[in-house]
Amino acid sequence: MKIESVTALVVNARQRNWVFVKMVTDQPGLIGWGEATIEWNTRAVVGAVEDAADFLVGEDPRRTEHLWQVLYRQRFFRGGAVVMSAISGIDQALHDIKAKDLGVPLYQLLGGLVRDRVRLYDHLGGGDTDAVYNDAAADRFAERAREIVGRGFTALKILAVPRTGMLDGVYGVRQAVGLMSAVREAVGDDVEVMVDLHGRTTPAMAIQYGHALAPLRPWFLEEPCPPGNVAALAEVARALPIPIATGERLVTRYEFREVLEQRACAVIQPDACHCGGISELKRIAAMAEPYFVSVAPHNPVGPIGTMAAIHFALSTPNFLIQEVMSADVPWRAEVVDQPLEIYQGHVLPPTRPGLGVEVDERAAARYAQGPEPKLRYFHPDGAVADW
């Protein structure tokens, strides 16, 4: 079996563009799909997929590990979010082909089932965070939280923290507590609520937020400070009684290594579309296991990336919970046939071979790449603010 072509297919998804990787083999009808979506870098990642294709055409797609090593090691410059997103989508497509060729769901090649269902959580913002978060209204937060729980979810995540300066006053902390209080009152104590700080805060501010939110029992506090300083993250983790989660902007096991060694979090959140694909996601999870760190994969992307994460979750012992986007664009199901059987906030194991997805390329063409919104956020004094 040989790879004949590797191409990128771009679909507009409003807040971002989905970047799908299509891998065609010389076997009639045997096509692999993956996802390399990375926010606000669409043209860059498409180019990275095209560059990688030169290393793949003519190769046997069943040599998944060998081809991962070729793409990672034989181009001298390693890592980086754009290149690793391209490798991630390609790696997913390789696994899809291999499992389809054998006629089994992908999780069977990843060690088989270690659980019979995968717990999911929804994000309060769905696929359009600005629509929910810009006015930061407590009643809107409560209404949206009740709607999510009404659909059977037993866990949800909120972004309750405003864009924060280096050392702000009490306004932001009061706002976060007010919003979290409204959500907790709306859903009760039996629903887990995670709070995302989105890397907006310094360690000093993150500690203030954490202590203020602790009585409301967040399940975990996500990305309390930007990536790049693991010692600062570890400082936050030691100072708070709330488990810390991080990792959505980290790629490869090499960037997760220091986080684990410094005991900087209780939950890691690698993204199957960024970190290096399914191959690297499994390695990162295995690294985390002896540190008693669980894995809650980051997943605000498209339906193919979601299926990759589901197969990972079904086959990984230290998996915790899976993020899904339930309300990004109404044409999601039109573009990708994604066989998710969801019951009471859980998804059951898919039964189709491979990842289990089918892409309607004609539908995808109707929703081709669109302009992504420009993230231009500033503090009142005009200084740049983090998204």
Which sequence ranges carry the predicted segments?
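Structured beta-strand/loop patches that form or line metal/cofactor-binding pockets in enzymes
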Residues: M1-W33, T37, A44, D328-V335, ...
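Conserved, mostly hydrophobic/aromatic
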Residues: I3, G29, A52, I90, ...
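Shared catalytic-loop signature of beta/alpha-barrel
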Residues: M23, G47, A52, H66, ...
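Metal- or metallocofactor-binding catalytic centers and their adjacent structured scaffolds
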Residues: D26-L102
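Glycine-rich, aromatic-flanked loop segments that form ligand/cofactor-binding clefts
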Residues: D91-V132
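Metal-dependent enolase-superfamily TIM-barrel catalytic cores that perform enediolate-based chemistry
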Residues: R117-A239
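Extended hydrophobic packing segments that form well-structured cores
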Residues: L355-W387
